[in-house]
Each structure stands twice: as C-alpha cells, then as structure tokens.
Regions:
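Catalytic cores and adjacent flexible loops of soluble metabolic enzymes
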Residues: 1-231
Length: 231
C-alpha cells in the first residue's frame, strides 16, 4: 500500500510531517512535485533530496501544464537521479503533443516510473496515453510482459464506446497506433480488414506480421498467406 502526497514545487518542507505520518502507519509514501518547471532543475533536485531524508520512497516530477520540452525533461530527470537514491518518476501532460516524447526523454535520463492514462484520459489536454507509451517502449525492446494487443482490444470493445457517451474521443485510435508501430501505410487498410474478417484472424496481429515482411506494398497474396498461417 502507498499514499501519494503532492505539493507545488518549492513547497516540499510542509510535506515532511505528512511523509513521516504515512511511513509511521506502515505505508510507502510517494510524492508529486506539481508544476516542477517553476524551479530550476538543480533547485528541484535539492528539494527532492530533502524529501528523501524525510523517508520518501518515490518522487515524481509533474509537468502539470504540459509545457516542458524533451531536453528540459532530460535535464530535470538527470539532475534528480544524481541527487537521490529513490526511484524518480515523470508525470507528463499532452498540451504541446509531447507527452510520449517526454516520457522517452525521462526514461533515457534515468526515470523508472511513468504516470499514464488509457486513451490519455486526464485533466486538460490529458496525460501520456498508456497504450502509446507501451507501444513506443515495446518498439525499444522494453515492457516485454505487456500484452499490448489485448489492451488495444479492451479500448476498442469496452473503453472507447463507454467514453463516447461522454463525448470523449481517443486522440490516437488503436488501429492507427498499430499502423505506426508496425510501419504499415493506412492505404492498405481495406485489404487488411477484409482479409482479417474473411479468415477470422486478429486484424492487429495480421498487420504486424505482414509488415515484418513487407512495409512497402504488401500484396493480397502475402496478406492471405500470413492470415492462413495464423489460424
């Protein structure tokens, strides 16, 4: 069990008593440095070190307005991982469309935890979409234990229809995510969907398998051959 405490960057001293109380009650304590960008990277890292001394178990830099650029994220994370021994996390918003790029920058700089939301659901422009982050990290050979296609089907079949009732639209649909992950041009969409329906195989898996062989101009024959082998 854990409890997360959050305060604006620079206000960490007022959280020390709360951190100690959480620890006293046998829980792990995580801390969110909201609006982390209002301090310099060095100042934020120094505050993180102070909070670690209070007994903190994990600390998160929050890009609360979605204003940070990848090079800034890299600088902030790099400074912090040099200052503390506890895990450093990153929480990005997508106001500039950089949430995934920022997550990549954070990971490369030493962050080990990332806040995400399915379909990017969160306040304002949303958080880094869980499925996008998973796809990108899998492209890099990470998150091998994550069943991405199962997650995408859950979004297609359950989550997206439920959220449509509230007017929420997924900024990047699962099928478009698969095209990007596989390197498949969407002009072949009908050929793939018709074959998957006819042969009763998983569309997303078919796109990925075919694209491993031909990303330029997959033929109907190749697509049908791969589909037949998937049965």
């Amino acid at each position: 069990h854990f409890l997360r405490i959050g305060a604006n960057a620079g206000d960490g001293k007022m959280a020390c008593d709360g951190i100690r109380e959480v620890k006293k009650n046998g829980m792990k304590c995580r801390y969110s440095m909201m609006k982390g960008y209002i301090l310099s990277a060095k100042e934020l890292a120094e505050e993180a070190a102070m909070l670690e001394e209070c007994g903190l178990d994990e600390i998160t830099i929050m890009d609360s307005a979605g204003t940070m650029m990848p090079h800034q994220v890299s600088e902030y994370i790099s400074e912090m991982v040099k200052k503390v021994k506890i895990p450093v996390a990153f929480h990005g918003h997508n106001n500039l469309g950089l949430s995934v790029a920022n997550a990549l920058a954070a990971e490369e700089a030493g962050a080990s935890v990332f806040d995400c939301g399915l379909m990017g659901m969160a306040r304002s422009a949303g958080n880094c979409a869980t499925e996008l982050a998973a796809a990108v990290f899998k492209r890099l050979g990470k998150l091998e234990d994550v069943d991405l296609l199962k997650l995408l089907h859950f979004i297609d079949n359950r989550l997206a229809p439920a959220m449509a009732e509230y007017g929420y639209k997924n900024p990047v649909s699962p099928i478009d995510l698969v095209y990007g992950m596989a390197g498949c041009h969407s002009s072949f969409a009908k050929l793939f969907s018709d074959t998957a329906e006819k042969e009763k195989v998983d569309l997303y898996e078919l796109i990925i398998k075919v694209s491993e062989i031909d990303k330029k101009a997959p033929s109907k024959e190749l697509i049908e051959q791969i589909a037949d082998g998937m049965k």
